[in-house]
Amino acid sequence: MKKILQIPNYMYPHIGGIEQVARDIADSLIGREDIEQKIICFNGDAADGDYVCHQKETVTDKVDGVDVVRCGCFTKIASQSLSMTYPKQLKKIINEFQPDIVIFHYPNPFVGEFLQHYFKKNFKLVVYWHLDITKQKILGKLFHGQTIRLLNRADRVVATSPNYIEGSPYLSQFRNKCIVIPNCIRTERLQPNETVLKKVQQLKEKYKDKTLCFGMGRHVPYKGYTYLIKASKLLDDNFVICIAGKGPLTDSLKEEAKDDPKVEFLGRVSDEDMIAYYMVCDIFCFPSITKNEAFGIALAEGMYFEKPAVTFTIPGSGVNYVNIAEETGIECPNGDVSAYAKALESLSKGKALREKYGKNAKKRVEENFMFDQLGEKVKELIDGL
């Protein structure tokens, strides 16, 4: 029996890339009689139907049958949650659960500091590297030593793309420990129902004779929506640019696009509306510009629906590993709005090119970024430790 402890930042119903990967890993191991799992994370205000979490509470519950210890938080500094109960709960789990394998999702410097206290314990350490700390430069410098100690102690380091290994100043020093496990999409949540199909017909009617470009994500700087809006201003009225999501930049983005009737802001969309837009759009726009975008699940989902993608070159990011230039879509020089607009124009005018890239895009996702493939790689990782 192998006991596995995962340490993500948060856990479902909190929505985020790291949280989804942690859930994917846990789900991939469910049903194995030789494995027992536990998860420790911060608590956060989040809900999904009757499943409600409160930031300040320290509780234990279950997600998909796996025990989750959620530690109440009193504040957040530089995107890092702080908790008074976390050290005690981590100590209890390490001493009582006695994990054979600890999967630590990086970055999480507050927890990394406490985890170091148990480095002499007899567990295998997997550092699951989601992204470099690039935005919070002071935080990155402050925890530089901790990061090196984590990587030195690690038995394996998981990156989500080979691009990130080569582009990270940390991972490139520890290539011999690194393996690649790409993130995955969950196709069960992407299946159209009657409501979706009805919405599809409505959208087709609304946007007939238009080239529909769809983008979806949080409205934050690294997502690059300002560049998509600037590119839209260079396009003719045959285009419509639909942007789903919300965030700190929503108001400023709307202000920037106020004189451009081609741009429509959809706000937060339901899964059903999201699927409908995936199905109806002609081009999937993913204008992220920095390594904070380490992979791009929404990008992979759009490609799964046979949509050619238009991305920017991001050195060291997995975005350009997901979308292959001139094979599954078009890659533009970083921040070059003129090139981005020309890419959209070429795909709009070239139906054969759109279809070629779209078919290749779906094939790439099916061959590389599916849940079963992640499960196999996680199994290889666990069994090899």
Predicted regions and their residues:
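Short alpha-helical donor nucleotide-sugar binding micro-motif in glycosyltransferases
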Residues: 151, 268-269, 276-281, 303
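N-terminal subdomain of nucleotide-sugar transferases
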Residues: 1-55, 64, 152
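Conserved donor-binding/catalytic core segment of Leloir-type glycosyltransferases
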Residues: 5, 197, 203-223, 229-233
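A short, active-site helix/loop in glycosyltransferases that binds the activated sugar's phosphate group
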Residues: 152-192
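Acidic donor-binding loop of glycosyltransferase active sites
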Residues: 279-294, 307
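Short hydrophobic beta-strand element within catalytic cores of glycosyltransferases
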Residues: 305-313
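Nucleotide-activated donor-binding/catalytic signature segment of Leloir-type glycosyltransferases, i.e.
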Residues: 251-272
